[in-house]
Amino acid sequence: MTAQTAEEHSLTAVIGLEVHVQLETDTKIFCGCSTDADDNEEPNTRTCPVCLGLPGALPVLNEGAVEAAVKVGKALSSDIPEETRFHRKNYYYPDLPKNFQITQYDAPICDGGELEFAVDDERRTVAIERAHLEEDPGSLSHAGGSIDTAEHTLVDYNRAGTPLLEIVTAPDFRSAAEVRAFLAKLTEVLEYLGVFDVTRDGSLRVDANLSIVDSDAVGENGSIDEATLEAANRTEVKNISSHKGAEKALAYEETRQKNAVQRGREVEQETRHWDESRGITVSMRSKEEEKDYRYFREADIPPLRVSDWKEKIDIPELPDARRERFREEYGLDAETASKLTSTKQVADFYERVADTFAPELAATWVADNLLGELNYRDMEITDIEGRLDEFAHLIELVDEDEITVKNAEEVVLRRMLDDGQPPGDIVEAEDLGKTDDDAVAAAVTAAIEENPDAVEDYHAGEDGALNFLVGQVMQETGGSADPGTVNELLRAELDG
């Protein structure tokens, strides 16, 4: 694209993704080494001759990895072929002990598919080109700086051989924000399927291909013809490990390329590294083409007939379907249903609570009160899964009018999360049981007698006066009176 063209027309980003998902299996994809990583483990201790690529070591395919891949394919509406095969992808890099990677080439385990998601309240659908199984390389630690400034680099092969599913999208994204929304939705689906651990470091990594085209080449539905795509030089951005990181990296790269085009410079076709600490991409190497990898069949792994058992693999209810069911079955609004299905653990927790209490009451407590307090403490629902009975008891105390909603929210729930105490003990220790009617009535009378100015303001029509008097009663009763009852008693006495 010439500088003149760039000045006359706006520019549009074209983005495609390669999403690498670490599958949740007990052992690596081609050997019996554990995948259970420990933050304190020594480097190069979860290895064997197979994952180190030593001569004579033969790979054995992990059935669990295949099952997980089939589940993902079904969730993405992919075609699961009758037969799938493995190939060797040849390249030289320090984290690849064999100097080739066992992956899939012309017969991936998942072919085609799509994923629908929302961005800025607009529904988008991105096509999935394929998803294939492969082994994860080792990991590199760049000492003394980032990849382009490090004094030296250390290699750890503990990760080598961890099962990966690489999900390749069509170049259907037109902004970094769309990419972030897509990754959030994909993560949600994968978590519901139970095929990966979202809390594990590096469990989802992204390589993104980005190029810039003239906006006039983009059709009304966002389509771009093949010739335009082929003519545009693209960069591959690596080292993206989060949804937020993907948005930041691609926003930077889009700006960098647009600036280059607008200044009449050619965009180099290269591989770039996202340096999160500096917020920039840096050049790594010229971008390889498919022919550079010299793919050939992996002779040590025979073709796999997935058709023999793929129909036996079921997938659970997915987030969109569960969201819709919550709205229909429990009468929830869209926002609340979305909160309650944000993760499978939250949805499961809510349904167990809703089995005991009115669904609307359970929804309010889980979606608004509990999730809000957990988020404030940087906790997850999984941190309290074993305390479901205690949480149910708290709702029961409110439902049976034994404590006020205010005390339940602001005292009991917070102490439960901070100190680990059961609700009954907190109520007893803090004397939070509801004040009896006579005591509330006495506190109402005292508030009126002791605050004549507020009474005068109330009769003058000032709205804040009643709230002040309610506050005085609540203070007198230690917050154990019901605010609604106090309000009614005050109005009755003031208006009588």
UniProtKB/Swiss-Prot annotation:
Catalyzed chemical reaction(s): L-glutamyl-tRNA(Gln) + L-glutamine + ATP + H2O = L-glutaminyl-tRNA(Gln) + L-glutamate + ADP + phosphate + H(+); L-aspartyl-tRNA(Asn) + L-glutamine + ATP + H2O = L-asparaginyl-tRNA(Asn) + L-glutamate + ADP + phosphate + 2 H(+)
A single MF term (Gene Ontology): asparaginyl-tRNA synthase (glutamine-hydrolyzing) activity
GO biological process terms on file: glutaminyl-tRNAGln biosynthesis via transamidation; translation
Subunit structure: Heterotrimer of A, B and C subunits.
Summary of the function given for this chain in its UniProt record: Allows the formation of correctly charged Asn-tRNA(Asn) or Gln-tRNA(Gln) through the transamidation of misacylated Asp-tRNA(Asn) or Glu-tRNA(Gln) in organisms which lack either or both of asparaginyl-tRNA or glutaminyl-tRNA synthetases. The reaction takes place in the presence of glutamine and ATP through an activated phospho-Asp-tRNA(Asn) or phospho-Glu-tRNA(Gln).
Protein EC: 6.3.5.-
Name of the protein described by the UniProt record: Aspartyl/glutamyl-tRNA(Asn/Gln) amidotransferase subunit B
PROSITE patterns linked to this entry: GATB
Entry keyword annotation includes Nuclease: no
Gene name of the record: gatB
NCBIfam families the record matches: gatB, PRK05477.1-2, PRK05477.1-4
Top EC class for this record: ligase
Gene3D superfamilies named in the record: 1.10.10.410, GatB domain, N-terminal subdomain
SMART domains recorded: GatB_Yqey
Protein's organism: Natronomonas pharaonis (strain ATCC 35678 / DSM 2160 / CIP 103997 / JCM 8858 / NBRC 14720 / NCIMB 2260 / Gabara) (Halobacterium pharaonis)
InterPro entries the UniProt entry points to: Asn/Gln-tRNA_amidoTrfase_suB/E, Asn/Gln-tRNA_Trfase_suB/E_cat, Asn/Gln_amidotransferase, Asn/Gln_tRNA_amidoTrase-B-like, GatB, GatB_C_1, GatB_Yqey_C_2, Gln-tRNA_amidoTrfase_suB_CS
Similarity comment: family membership: Belongs to the GatB/GatE family. GatB subfamily.
Superkingdom of origin: Archaea
Bilayer-spanning residue ranges: none
Annotated keywords: ATP-binding, Ligase, Nucleotide-binding, Protein biosynthesis
